[in-house]
Amino acid sequence: MPRKLYSPKHSSNPYIKDFDEYKELYKQSIEDPSKFFKNLANENISWMEDFKTTFNNQFNNAKWFEGGKTNISLNCIDRHLENDPNKIALIWEGDDPADSKELTYKELHDEVCKFANVLKDLGVQKGSRVCIYMPMIIETAFAMLACTRIGAVHSVVFGGFSPESLKDRILDADCKIVITADEGLRGGKKVPLKSNVDEALLGCPDVKNTLVIKRTGGEINWDDKKDVWYEDLVKDVSNKCAPEPMDSEDPLFILYTSGSTGKPKGVLHTTAGYLLGAHISFKYLFGIRPEDKYWCTADVGWITGHTYILYGPLSNGATTLMFEGVPTYPSASRCWEICDKHDISIFYTAPTAIRALMAQGDDPVKKTKRDSLRILGTVGEPINPEAWDWYYSVVGKSNCEVIDTWWQTETGSVLISPIAGITPTKPGSATLPFFGVKPSLYDEHGNTLEGSNAGNLVIEQSWPSQIRSIYGDHQRMIDTYFGMYKDIYFTGDGARRDEDGYFWITGRVDDVLNVSGHRLGTAEIESALVLHPKIAEAAVVGFDHPIKGQGIYAFVTLMINESFDDNFSYELKQFVAKEIGAIAKPDLIQNAPGLPKTRSGKIMRRILRKIAENDLSNLGDTTTLADPSVVESLIENKQSL
């Protein structure tokens, strides 16, 4: 059934005249990307030294703007000081509605320089890896920007990850310093960040210092040899620190994302290409105006927080809001109260949050005005049309454009999305590709699927902000993204293209789940489950979840003579939360005396997905199973859940 087409509500985008101009610019970006991006890089980046070549023409070993030197912090802060030093750069909204502050670009400059000097005094230098395990407080922005200022490579780990997950990421990136807070605050509850770091560091002997920011003043353990208070060090440092000239391809940050194998991948992004992608996507897609106040609800522990809370908005000289809390605390009106309080004009959130707020009904929204809003964005997973319609009609009062963006940690910036004021939208569709992005649909044999069709979503040519490597394992990067289709980037997502050429993302086609907009590898969760002494084997699949998009469904086979009940199910969920983090806790755990396997021993996840989804009449061919009776017992056990 064709979806309704929504024409843009706002007839103008400051940077693109109309839909025809978008199509012409897009054509130029695909036909001659070197010329197109050379011009954009010169127009949008402040260079310390000009680049010599635009692109090296190697998709799986891409290098953009070689020979050039720049600095992210210079582009995000210093270049705005001459014309608008007193413009608000950051608005911080605390977990408690009474707690908020604003910083101008000049104040941000001073704080970032001081933080950079503290890091230098602790021995951090160009190329050092710095782990940041922080709540959403304003010092987190200082820490990230300070790393970029001195050329250190930050590795931000989401504050919801467990000590075990944190340890793995510290070791993989070989970080010598961890930046954390005494505790975090979320939804009125304290998060024991320093305590988690202490536990993680028991397995990280090479970490020299833990730099601790005081957030709650709660009691924490202290190691005089290793732990240092930020507040003690920052008193004695200068508020001046020159930005380090960085080669275009110098590493900028590592961000871990889940893979279909157990070990998380350290996605490596580099300086100039990432900066350009973040800058131009934010500028064009949101049609940013000088008076805009922008709020992305993500955590900086995810790529959305990197690109669209900090680097995209700040490089454009915009005003960006950081929120410490959760959308439903202290009430389900919180998001919309913040929009009214700070006159937010652009609001960017995940479908999971939209569905959770939608479940609270219209009243919490209608208690607020929301008159300042002009653009509503969505990110992290496909948005179902019902949630899109509610977002558009109830939150936006049918007067705001909805910008449904598709991209990944590995892409660095948005690849498929409407452009505000330009692209007609359809509820549930990410619509059309951004400049320089050449998406296509392939079948499993590598054949191109033309016209209105469905298949595996691939990108056929490089773009500036693409992944450069997996930290310490470039071959894994090639195998993961360029192995299925030679020299073509495989996204791991399925999509369909309609008769208008619009793309509709249908979800993961590999063994990665998208839970509340966060990617989790099934292998990682399975590995955590089988660490439990009572578990012999585990298989994890996704199922449709009304709020999270995908829920986590675990099938577990117990060791001999062990028994399964509700208490043990609860124990297992807590066990996984401790190993990985609460975000990976299974929603449902089913006792599985046996798992459906082929004669070669491969688990047939297709059948497990059908059982998890309760699609029992459509299990497909089970003749290749070593023991087809296993399926009957799984269905029987399913009924008792």
Curated annotation (Swiss-Prot):
GO cellular component, as recorded: cytosol
Keyword Magnesium recorded: yes
Pfam family, one: AMP-binding_C
Catalytic activity: acetate + ATP + CoA = acetyl-CoA + AMP + diphosphate
Enzyme Commission numbers on file: 6.2.1.1
Entry superkingdom: Bacteria
UniProt keywords, alphabetically: Acetylation, ATP-binding, Ligase, Magnesium, Metal-binding, Nucleotide-binding
Changes after translation: Acetylated. Deacetylation by the SIR2-homolog deacetylase activates the enzyme.
Sites where the protein binds Mg(2+): V530, H532, I535
UniProt cofactor(s): Mg(2+)
Residues annotated for CoA binding in this entry: R186, G187, G188, K189, T304, S516
Classification via Gene3D superfamilies: 3.30.300.30, N-terminal domain of ligase-like (3.40.50.12780)
GO annotation terms (biological process): acetyl-CoA biosynthetic process from acetate
Uppermost EC category: ligase
Positions with a binding annotation for ATP: G380, E381, P382, D404, T405, W406, W407, Q408, T409, D493, R508, R519
Molecular-function GO terms, alphabetical: acetate-CoA ligase activity; AMP binding; ATP binding; metal ion binding
Assigned protein family: Belongs to the ATP-dependent AMP-binding enzyme family.
Annotated function: Catalyzes the conversion of acetate into acetyl-CoA (AcCoA), an essential intermediate at the junction of anabolic and catabolic pathways. AcsA undergoes a two-step reaction. In the first half reaction, AcsA combines acetate with ATP to form acetyl-adenylate (AcAMP) intermediate. In the second half reaction, it can then transfer the acetyl group from AcAMP to the sulfhydryl group of CoA, forming the product AcCoA.
Protein name: Acetyl-coenzyme A synthetase
Species name: Gamma-proteobacterium EBAC31A08
Source taxonomy: Bacteria, Pseudomonadati, Pseudomonadota, Gammaproteobacteria, environmental samples
